[in-house]
Amino acid sequence: VENDVKMFILCNPYNPIGKVWKEDELKQIGEICKKHHVLVIVDEIHEDFVYGDHVHIPFYNVDESYKEFSVVLTAPSKTFNLAGLQTSNIIIANEKLRKVYQETMNRYGVNEPNFLGIIACMTAYNECELWVDEMLEYVYDNFTYFDEFLKENLPHIHLVKPEGLYLCWVDFRECGLDKDELEKTMLEKAGLWLD
C-alpha cells in the first residue's frame, strides 16, 4: 500500500507450499485490499487439493463485497489433468471489470474457447466427483508412504505435512548442515540439483 500497490495476487491454496488460507486470513487480505482499492486476482486452480481438516474457502464466499474488486481464476487442468486442452474459468462478478477484460480479449483475439476443452471441463465438473475423491486419496497415500520412508530410512529428514497441493516439502534442519553443505550433499550424493 505504501508503494501504491494496484494489484494483489492471492493463490489459494498457496502454490508452491500448499498453505490453505483460513477464513479470517482471507478476510484480513480482503479488507486491506478493499480499503486501499487494490484489485485482487485470486488463483484458485488448486482448490480441490486440500487435505485433513483444512477447507478451501472461495474468496467470493468470504464477503459479498469482495466481488467488486476481485477476479477469480479456476481451471480443471490440475484436478483433472486437462492442461493440454487449455481451458480455464475466469469469474468476474463486477460488470465494469468484466467489460474491460472482454474488450481486452477481443482486441488481442484470444477470446475463442477450445470447444473440446469446454466439453471436458463441463464433464469433469459435473460427472467426476468420485474420480476426484479417489485421486486425492491416492495423492495423500503418496504423502503417507513418503513420510514413512523418511522415518524408517532418513530419520533426520521430516516431511512437512501438506495442507493442500500435491508437492512434498521436506525439513532438513536436523541434519546439521548449512545451506551450502546441504546443496553440495544433495547434488553429489542424491543427484538432485536445487534451484
Short names for language-model regions:
Residues 1-52:
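Active-site phosphate-binding strand-loop segment of PLP-dependent enzymes
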Residues 64, 68-140, 147-148, 152:
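Conserved core segment of the aminotransferase class I/II
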Residues 35-36, 66, 190:
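Helix C-cap/helix->beta junction micro-motif
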Residues 122, 137-147, 159-172:
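Conserved glycine-rich beta-strand-loop-beta hairpin in the small C-terminal domain of fold type I
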Residues 157-158, 170-195:
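Conserved C-terminal alpha-helix-loop-beta "cap" of PLP-dependent enzymes
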Residues 41, 71-73, 160, 193-195:
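Structural detector of well-ordered beta-strand residues that form the stable sheet scaffold
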Residues 33, 63, 150, 186-187:
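A generic structural signal for well-ordered alpha-helical segments
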